[in-house]
């Protein structure tokens, strides 16, 4: 056993089975066929973070690239999802073929506080010990389960949920399964959430979609029974009629640049259920339909009400199955006038057609967070942001600012100066409201003071309510509508991810990590779209956080 204390500003300690340095979970595909998929999983240890509980000092267990189970009252342990393609109708079952484990004695593992909003201070949430703390048994009892099957455009898939750690609260024993061989075997053609039809004999996908499948599915390379054809993917724009003339230059550019694009008015599609039916029919008739852009605001092109708290544009892209994974990637330009529509179109056209790719500001990034929380892996928000900073600075970013409340205490003036210098990407993690960020009380007012003419950032914001479109002008809308009144040039942002709901602490942090990871992966001849990076990263939340029940994903 090896112990290593973290060099970060919070008390995290590595406990290794046979390695003195932290090692990440390893997954290996052994074999894959229609009948059976076999996977090997290896784990080399765990991190433990000390916490104060009603029973004294206990520890939270975590591991890189894994997710907390978030079951309130159960031992706080990591789990790991492995996404795999399965048959269109198959019912699968999972079994452990073989395993090895190491036991660690005299460890007291704290219970999970569960999944809750960032409006709640984690320190104010009491530890509750569930019934499993009274049982002389290891929790969880199984080291592998199967989540519900889902359909993601061309494939039906299922997440293999791996639990390499098990805890017996009575004997105070943490069991680490260092080696697992897991079989996922077909048992019938009576599976739930079946993919009942295919729209064409061949699978047409663009380079970005192919890369997303390769990243997501452990057995994508084994799908030899399908014919794959390269295709750019079609875009459908649904626009409030009075803005269609202003949006037409974007339609023309998309078609010229190789992405077949069609625009229709809301008078033709309707809204809410009628629009969903229109999009569904369009999807059924156009096998290459990949992107949906909505142009309008809450009052004339509303998001879909999925629940009391969740309003969703993503819903319009959920076109197969009874799951939340989108077949079509959905974005929005929230505009209030033709002039506003023209301004936002000009942002996109400049970014895609005219930007100087050698401009030094493109190698800059902005990070905004605070010394608050314990989010995923027990990290305070600013530590989470430092990890993102490290990821970006191993890519093409050479400078990333660190605006951290309760660390270096930035002001709104500091942040305005930073944004005015230009930044290609901005990450925010902390508290928010419909009209701003909590850090430095940076609000709509400050966004409209920016003079970053055509030096526009793309923003991934982990915060409450920044994208609440029924607000008179929400924070997301301010970033997209901003203009320098003196020059007439677009300012603010070129796009972003902002949530409708009061986001929880942990689930969106996994999504934000994945967005930055996708952005920075290197592939020969491969260019990302910011929409593809963002929405594929958002779907990762569904994999990592089943306890969240889709709320983060659907409303972001």
Q: Would you name each region that the model predicts?
A:
Residues 279-308, 371-373, 377-473:
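Catalytic-core segments of thiol-dependent peptidases
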Residues 299, 369, 467-556:
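Active-site-proximal C-terminal subdomain of hydrolase catalytic domains
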Residues 1-13, 549-551:
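Bacterial Sec-dependent N-terminal signal peptides
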Residues 314, 318-352, 357, 434-511:
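Catalytic cores of nucleophile-dependent amide-cleaving enzymes
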Residues 10-268, 273-291:
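Extracellular pro-sequences of secreted precursors
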Residues 231-235, 256-262, 286-291, 355-366, ...:
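Loop/turn elements at helix/coil->beta-strand transitions in domains of secreted/extracellular proteins
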Residues 235-263, 326-413:
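A domain-level signal for caspase-like cysteine endopeptidase catalytic cores
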Residues 163-165, 238-242, 264-269, 294-298, ...:
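Active-site-proximal beta-strand/loop segments in catalytic clefts of secreted hydrolases
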């Amino acid at each position: 056993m090896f112990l290593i204390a973290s060099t970060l500003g919070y008390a995290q300690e590595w406990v290794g089975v046979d390695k003195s340095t932290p090692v990440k979970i390893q997954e290996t595909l052994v074999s894959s066929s229609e009948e059976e998929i076999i996977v090997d999983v290896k784990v080399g240890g765990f991190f433990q973070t000390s916490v104060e509980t009603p029973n004294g000092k206990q520890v939270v267990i975590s591991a890189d690239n894994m997710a907390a189970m978030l079951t309130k009252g159960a031992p706080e342990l990591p789990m790991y999802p492995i996404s795999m393609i399965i048959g269109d109708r198959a019912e699968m079952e999972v079994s452990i073929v073989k395993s090895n484990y190491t036991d660690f004695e005299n460890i007291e593992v704290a219970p999970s506080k569960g999944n809750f909003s960032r409006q709640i201070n984690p320190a104010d949430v009491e530890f509750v010990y569930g019934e499993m703390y009274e049982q002389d048994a290891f929790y969880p009892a199984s080291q592998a389960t199967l989540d519900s099957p889902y359909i993601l455009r061309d494939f039906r898939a299922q997440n293999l949920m791996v639990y390499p750690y098990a805890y017996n609260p009575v004997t105070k024993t943490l069991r680490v399964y260092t080696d697992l061989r897991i079989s996922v075997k077909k048992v019938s053609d009576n599976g739930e959430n079946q993919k009942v039809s295919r729209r064409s004999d061949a699978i047409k996908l663009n380079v970005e979609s192919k890369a997303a499948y390769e990243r997501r599915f452990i057995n994508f390379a084994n799908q030899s029974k399908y014919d794959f054809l390269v295709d750019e993917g079609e875009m459908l724009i649904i626009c409030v009629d009075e803005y269609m003339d202003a949006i037409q230059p974007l339609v023309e550019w998309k078609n010229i640049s190789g992405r077949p694009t069609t625009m229709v008015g809301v008078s033709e599609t309707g809204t809410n259920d009628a629009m969903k039916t229109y999009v569904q029919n369009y999807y059924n008739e156009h096998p290459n339909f990949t992107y949906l852009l909505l142009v309008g605001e809450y009052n004339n092109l509303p998001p879909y009400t999925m629940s009391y708290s969740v309003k969703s544009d993503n819903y319009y892209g959920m076109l197969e199955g009874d799951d939340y994974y989108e077949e079509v990637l959905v974005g929005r330009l929230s505009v209030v006038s033709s002039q506003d529509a023209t301004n936002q179109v000009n942002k996109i056209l400049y970014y895609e057609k005219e930007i100087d790719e050698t401009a030094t500001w493109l190698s800059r990034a902005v990070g905004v967070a605070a010394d608050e929380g314990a989010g995923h892996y027990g990290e305070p928000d600013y530590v989470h942001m430092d990890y993102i900073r490290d990821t970006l600075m191993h890519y093409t970013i050479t400078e990333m600012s660190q605006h951290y409340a309760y660390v270096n205490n930035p002001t709104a003036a500091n942040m305005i100066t930073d944004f005015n210098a230009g930044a290609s990407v901005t990450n925010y993690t902390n508290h928010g409201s419909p009209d701003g960020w909590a850090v430095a009380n940076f609000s709509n007012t400050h966004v409209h003071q920016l003079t970053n003419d055509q030096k526009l950032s793309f923003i991934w914001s982990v915060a409450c309510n920044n994208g609440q479109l029924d607000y008179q002008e929400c924070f997301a809308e301010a970033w997209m509508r901003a203009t320098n009144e003196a020059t007439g040039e677009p300012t603010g942002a070129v796009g972003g991810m902002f949530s409708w709901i009061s986001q929880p602490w942990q689930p969106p942090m996994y999504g934000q990590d994945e967005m930055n990871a996708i952005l920075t992966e290197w592939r020969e001849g491969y260019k990302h779209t910011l929409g593809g990076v963002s929405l594929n990263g958002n779907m990762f939340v569904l994999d990592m956080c089943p306890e969240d029940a889709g709320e983060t994903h659907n409303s972001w």
